Amino acid sequence: MHFMKKYLLPILVLFLAYYYYSTKEEFRPEMLQGKKVIVTGASKGIGREMAYHLSEMGAHVVLTARSEEGLQKVASRCLELGAASAHYIAGTMEDMTFAEQFVLKAGKLMGGLDMLILNHITYTSMNFFRDEIHALRKAMEVNFISYVVMSVAALPMLKQSNGSIVVVSSIAGKMAHPLVASYSASKFALDGFFSSLRREHGVTNVNVSITLCVLGLINTETAMKATSGVFNAPASPKEECALEIIKGGALRQEEVYYDSWSWTPILLGNPGRKIMEFLSMKSFTFDKLISS
């Protein structure tokens, strides 16, 4: 108790004051002008809206999704909105070779890469988990493993540009929900992996930011179909959600919260976890690993 009063509580107060009241840089659309950006899951929903916002800001975009017809329409609209360039490559993120090669091809098309926005998912219906190991494996591969594969492929280019990785996740990856066990597992995996990778970047002085976007229910066709009749909550607009994701990536924020409930970022932002992460870093010795 004495330790808490003397040390832990003052640290907590200082941390909270800094976290909630520190001056943050304001977003400006010019931040994306001429930037080279990959957007996955871009044929519809949040991905499509991000592609449109980026185009209005004058970015170069390379888009991917499974639907070539959908991508063609989105890319054409991107050029109309003012994209510096707009390309697309259709394919499935179940194929890890495609995931890797897409990033490399996109980099060649744009002559580099400034921002990798990972937004794709495999469709998962809401139901009780019983023995659907195949569905669990597919969710982990598409929603998580492919994100890692693409990040690994993109890192050499992002290191050159001091760029950003933007990972679109979910509240289901921060707190337990029923009926979405496989989906939730893949989203928790994103938080664990990319939050750890962010800490490693800090230790090794890699100037590539990682932004985890924690979303509530968004009014995309896929989400509305999946939740119909089993989950009743107000859905937030995909257009505004897409813009908040881009802002968070451009400002190099660690996390972005977007949900209809205003208390979500306060309750899930979890300053206690951040304090524990900060304190735990003092237990590691990295010299041997860095020099090897």
UniProtKB/Swiss-Prot annotation:
Binding locations of substrate: 170
An example Gene Ontology biological process: steroid catabolic process
Pathway: Steroid metabolism
Active site: 183
Keywords carried by this UniProt record: Endoplasmic reticulum, Glycoprotein, Lipid metabolism, Membrane, NADP, Oxidoreductase, Signal-anchor, Steroid metabolism, Transmembrane, Transmembrane helix
Segments forming a coiled coil: none
Annotated glycan sites: 162, 207
Parts of the chain that traverse the membrane: 8-24
Tissue: Detected in adrenal gland, liver, kidney, testis, and at lower levels in brain and lung (at protein level).
Protein location: Endoplasmic reticulum membrane
Record topology, Cytoplasmic segments: 2-7
Catalytic activity annotation: an 11beta-hydroxysteroid + NADP(+) = an 11-oxosteroid + NADPH + H(+); corticosterone + NADP(+) = 11-dehydrocorticosterone + NADPH + H(+); a 7beta-hydroxysteroid + NADP(+) = a 7-oxosteroid + NADPH + H(+); 7-oxocholesterol + NADPH + H(+) = 7beta-hydroxycholesterol + NADP(+)
Gene Ontology CC: endoplasmic reticulum membrane
Top-level division of the source organism's lineage: Eukaryota
Subunit structure: Homodimer.
Assigned protein family: Belongs to the short-chain dehydrogenases/reductases (SDR) family.
Protein name: 11-beta-hydroxysteroid dehydrogenase 1
Originating species: Mesocricetus auratus
Gene behind this protein: HSD11B1
